[in-house]
Amino acid sequence: MTLRRLFAATTLALAATAIAGCSGAPSEDDDASAGSNQAATIARPPQFVILAFDGSYNLPFWRESRAFAASNNLKFTYFISGVYFIPNAAKAGYVGPRNGAGKSAIGWGGTAAEIAERYEEVRLAAAAGHEIASHANGHFDGSSWSESDWNSEFDQFDKIMFEGVGVRAPRLGFGARDVVGFRAPQLGHSPGLFRTLPNKSYAYDTSKSDAANYWPEKNNGVWNFPLARLRIVGSNKATLSMDYNFYVADSRGEPNAANKETYKKQMIDTYMAYFQANYFGNRAPLHIGHHFSKWNGGAYWEAMQAFAKRVCGQPEVKCGTYKDLVKFVEENKDKRRELQAGSFTQLPRPPGAASSALEDVPESEIAGTAEDHAAHDDNEANE
């Protein structure tokens, strides 16, 4: 049975359960005998599916992604890069830690007019309920940075976004204190980062990776929301739940649009296996990270859209922002052990559905090194 047919059958079964119980969602009483063998000690949590983007350069992609979200009742989290809000002519106004003034691994924002449009896209996204989070500035690998380096990077991000460098920043409808999430460029984190984040009032970080069924933990006052380590269905290659890593695993980070449909199907199938394992298992949040790039002919952006359409309207699924997830885990932080163990009445797992314990892929096998990752965002507009 294909994943498409399997999930369609599952959806029909859940709908039948809901109708039988005169409810809009499956009830725990209805499926108590068919679900988990864990003792039910807490209420079944929603299945969070977090869909996020790194980058923010490509203006048409801003509009396309917002339109898709509006049509499909979901919210994105946008991790934005500060240098895309600095005009080319003002690049000396940014001093990257250990790199010096006027240096960026991903280029700059273009003209003042282009930057004004980009600020407006940020404002519109926030006004529509999407979350704006930080991807730092120059897209440098910070894995060796000190606390002082990170402090400088965060301070410059706030100045760029809310005061302006080379242009005057407009009012965005939110302020620096409303930016509470971070993903390190190249996922390059260091001990200095995790000392800096709580001091800057950040609530969560998404720079690490972990098993697909991991429930978030709070470390040093900051929630850990890691990307998942997965096997690509169809090739068995290792990847993170991020489009760039699929791109490297599929075609070594080189364009190969001729195989677009294969890559698209494999990503959909992989994300569906990730979803099914958790949805019918311990309900650990799904973390999916993409970029404003249409690599391999748009295979990965199309796959993300197809996946979102398939799951975001399902019972007990919440395709929200990381801020939504923060609220839930804060309210349930004393239940983290039970959530990780799946100590609630789980939905019956259909025959053929992905296992509740996907293989924990060794991080050393993941395709996409920091060096490969360094320049990928610079080509957002052209991929």
Predicted feature locations:
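C-terminal motif of bacterial Sec signal peptides marking the signal peptidase cleavage site
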Residues: 19-21
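Active-site beta->alpha N-cap acidic-glycine motif
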Residues: 39-131, 138-141, 160-194, 211, ...
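An active-site-proximal "capping" alpha-helix that borders the catalytic cofactor pocket
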Residues: 150-164
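Post-signal peptide N-terminal segment of mature Sec-exported envelope proteins
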Residues: 30-42
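Bacterial N-terminal signal peptides that target proteins for export
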Residues: 1-11
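Active-site-adjacent pocket scaffolds in enzyme catalytic domains
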Residues: 95-105, 109-111, 170-180, 184-282, ...
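C-terminal domain-boundary segment and adjacent tail
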Residues: 40-41, 204-216, 269-383
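Bacterial signal peptide processing site
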Residues: 23-25
